[in-house]
């Protein structure tokens, strides 16, 4: 009862717009979770080679990357409520169309459409949360946000995998069962626009009056040059991380089914468990950040994930692969809300939309470029060495990104500390 009361009390303390956004995002991410686990299995069930999955991931990621910056520029000037609502509706409709597409051209075109529309939520979520919270709450709210995203994806991925297996056991063909579940996922994402209709339009003006104006009266404006310097640093780090992720993350379900021949339910449950562990690590992330500093916390989480990443790539034992996958998933992703908080704190309000869009663009470009590389390595070296090589390449890229992140942002933090001490 005490835990339930604490959760209820914490929920009520959130602003109205934050609660509505969290509800909408939960529906949206349930649909995304279903697609993340089942869609490349659907492509495989249609009889396409693994290279087709690589193509789909690449074109979708590239489409998303291409519109990140335009949406970021629009988001700094337009209604976040309108853009989020459009994103939910169009993403849901594109998902529903993808559930029944089977021809190569249809698969590619709808992948492009889904990639374009998915950018709305990815770009606008962080600026929306930032404008509806004060600085002291941001790290906590970002942790809640990323944890809620993963919790909803747990429901989507685990529920989708189990439902697909149940439909097959009831006599439905594999392709039809996957189509049914994918359509349900699209409908869930579509319904996300309903809570967004009740978001108050005056939220942005309210925050500007209460927080930005007093700060402007007491602090000099951040020079645009400093903003763009910070944005470029964040973008470079995310490009390297995205390149590494693009070799492994989109194909984790295929990794388990190809190497260990496990069922759809097992894959869905395993990926869901990884997300549950990530939720826990994200919630304890702010505590670590308060103790060692946010930059060091990001680097520690990322570096601790590397041994588990390599063990996953090289093991032939399903039990070991499952355990190492869970720890890698939790540790690597635990840094995400901390990184968002660092970026929001180091970039002024006027450029947060473009900052988030540029870092997201860099990350998705990494995914887009690595799809064909992963497919080639898997085709050329088989399901053991192909995955071993891609996991190893990802490890090298993660080490590079972590080292770069530490030295770039450690210098800025040290300079700020010296300035504060001098005062």
Model-derived regions: residue spans:
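Cytoplasmic helix-loop-helix junction between adjacent transmembrane helices
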Residues: 110-149
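A membrane-interface helix-boundary motif in multi-pass transporters
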Residues: 165-187, 376-398
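Hydrophobic core of transmembrane alpha-helices in multi-pass small-molecule transporters
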Residues: 26, 94, 105-121, 239, ...
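Structural signature of the two symmetry-related core transmembrane helices
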Residues: 82-97, 296-311
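Helix-to-loop junctions at the C-terminal end of transmembrane segments
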Residues: 67-79, 164, 281-293, 378-379
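Helix-loop boundary and gating motifs at the non-cytosolic
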Residues: 3-66, 230-271
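Multi-pass alpha-helical transporter architecture, strongest
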Residues: 188-203, 306, 392-423
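Juxtamembrane intracellular "pre-TM" segments in multi-pass secondary transporters
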Residues: 1-15, 201-237, 422-423
């Amino acid at each position: 009862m005490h835990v339930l009361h604490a959760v209820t009390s914490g929920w009520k303390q959130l602003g109205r717009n934050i609660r509505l956004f969290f509800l909408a995002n939960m529906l949206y991410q349930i649909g995304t979770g279903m697609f993340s686990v089942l869609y490349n299995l659907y492509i495989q069930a249609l009889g396409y080679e693994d290279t087709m999955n690589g193509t789909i991931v690449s074109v979708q990621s590239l489409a998303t990357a291409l519109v990140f910056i335009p949406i970021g520029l629009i988001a700094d000037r337009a209604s976040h409520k309108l853009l989020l609502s459009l994103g939910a509706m169009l993403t849901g409709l594109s998902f529903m169309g993808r559930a029944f597409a089977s021809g190569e051209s249809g698969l590619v075109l709808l992948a492009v459409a889904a990639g374009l529309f998915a950018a709305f939520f990815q770009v606008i979520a962080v600026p929306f949360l930032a404008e509806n919270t004060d600085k002291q709450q941001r790290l906590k709210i970002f942790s809640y946000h990323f944890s809620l995203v993963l919790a909803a994806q747990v429901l989507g991925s685990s529920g989708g995998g189990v439902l697909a297996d149940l439909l097959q056991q009831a006599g439905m063909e594999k392709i039809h069962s996957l189509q049914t579940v994918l359509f349900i996922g699209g409908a869930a994402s579509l319904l996300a626009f309903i809570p967004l209709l009740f978001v108050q339009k005056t939220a942005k003006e309210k925050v500007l009056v209460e927080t930005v104006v007093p700060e402007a009266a007491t602090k000099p404006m951040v020079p645009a040059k400093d903003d763009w310097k910070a944005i470029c640093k964040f973008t470079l780090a995310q490009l390297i991380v995205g390149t590494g992720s693009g070799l492994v993350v989109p194909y984790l379900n295929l990794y388990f089914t190809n190497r260990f021949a496990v069922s759809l339910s097992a894959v869905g449950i395993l990926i869901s468990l990884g997300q549950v562990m990530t939720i826990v690590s994200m919630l304890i992330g702010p505590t670590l950040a308060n103790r060692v500093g946010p930059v060091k916390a990001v680097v520690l989480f990322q570096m601790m994930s590397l041994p588990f990443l390599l063990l996953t790539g090289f093991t032939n034992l399903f039990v070991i692969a499952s355990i190492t996958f869970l720890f890698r998933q939790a540790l690597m992703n635990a840094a995400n809300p901390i990184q968002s908080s660092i970026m929001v704190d180091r970039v002024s309000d006027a450029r947060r939309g473009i900052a988030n869009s540029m870092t997201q663009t860099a990350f998705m470009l990494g995914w887009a470029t690595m799809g064909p590389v992963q497919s080639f390595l898997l085709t050329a070296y088989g399901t053991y060495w192909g995955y071993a090589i891609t996991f190893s390449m990802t490890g090298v890229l993660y080490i590079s990104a972590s080292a770069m992140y530490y030295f770039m942002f450690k210098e800025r933090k040290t300079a700020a500390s010296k300035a504060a001490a001098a005062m």
